[in-house]
């Protein structure tokens, strides 16, 4: 906890094309080595592919994908008397959004398609349909929290 008072959360600007904060966050996660224009080109091209394949608004498909990926529980390590327990805790909304976007980019990079545009578009479509590696990661996180429910009373 900081001594100077509460930390003010930075306001994320909307992206210029879709006027969406979610797209802006996704661009920030795709960004590597400070190449923001390249990250924007990748995300916008991927969203164009999503709109062609899904034949609906790409931002709504992205939001649906993030809703399917957003975790509600996670485990945190808690040391009690010489042993470490995995304690399930609820995830705050900002962290849940950040985790969903992070998982989406990580698992899209791990895909086998040729370009990052194709990988990101495919992962967004898979996540919006409730399948894919990103959704599996969320289910694994929930399964881990469920299996350690006995240690929930150690929550701090």
From Swiss-Prot:
Q: Which GO terms describe its molecular function?
A: rRNA binding; structural constituent of ribosome; tRNA binding
Q: Which family does it belong to?
A: Belongs to the universal ribosomal protein uS7 family.
In the UniProt record, the gene name given for this protein reads: rpsG
Tagged with keyword tRNA-binding: yes
Alphabetical list of Pfam families matching this protein: Ribosomal_S7 (PF00177)
User: Which species is this record about?
Assistant: Tropheryma whipplei (strain Twist)
- What protein name is recorded for this chain? Small ribosomal subunit protein uS7
Stored PROSITE patterns? RIBOSOMAL_S7
User: What this chain does, per the record?
Assistant: One of the primary rRNA binding proteins, it binds directly to 16S rRNA where it nucleates assembly of the head domain of the 30S subunit. Is located at the subunit interface close to the decoding center, probably blocks exit of the E-site tRNA.
């Amino acid at each position: 906890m900081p001594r100077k008072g509460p930390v003010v959360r930075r306001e994320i600007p909307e992206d210029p094309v879709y006027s969406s904060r979610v797209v802006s966050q996704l661009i920030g996660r795709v960004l590597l080595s400070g190449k923001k224009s390249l990250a924007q080109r990748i995300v916008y091209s991927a969203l164009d592919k999503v709109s062609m394949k899904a034949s609906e608004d790409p931002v709504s498909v992205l939001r649906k994908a993030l809703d399917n990926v957003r975790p509600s529980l996670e485990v945190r390590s808690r040391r009690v008397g010489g042993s470490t327990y995995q304690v399930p805790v609820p995830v705050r909304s900002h962290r849940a959004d950040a985790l969903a976007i992070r998982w989406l980019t990580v698992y899209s990079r791990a895909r086998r398609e040729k370009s990052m545009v194709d990988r990101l578009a495919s992962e967004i479509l898979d996540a919006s349909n409730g399948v894919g590696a990103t959704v599996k990661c969320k289910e694994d996180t929930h399964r881990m929290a469920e299996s350690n429910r006995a240690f929930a009373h150690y929550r701090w």
